[in-house]
Amino acid sequence: MQLRDKLFINGAWTAPHGKGTIDVHSASTEAVIAKIPAGDEHDAAAGVAAARAAFEGWAATPPADRAAFLAKINEGLKARSEEIGKTIAQEVGMPVKLAT
């Protein structure tokens, strides 16, 4: 079982203000395959504030630079595609091949 205990807010993994967790279930077995932080209104407000603060800078970034940044994100997702695909397949009950 995977245990994630932080939220990604403002470019960093941070401990959530909220103390609860959410169980992620396998669609086929209903077993708990992961636990993720539930967060609360303070966590949501921090995420929204970070997004608002970043918006003007992102909007002013030249399109070529934004494209390069998105290409790096794509590389990271491709590098983890097997892990991500397996998690999605378990959670929604689809074949791994379709989830990757």
Residue ranges and their predicted role:
Residues 1-36, 68, 72:
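Terminal low-complexity tails and localization/encapsulation signals of metabolic enzymes
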Residues 33-100:
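Glycine-rich loop-to-alpha-helix module at the N-terminal edge of alpha/beta enzyme cores
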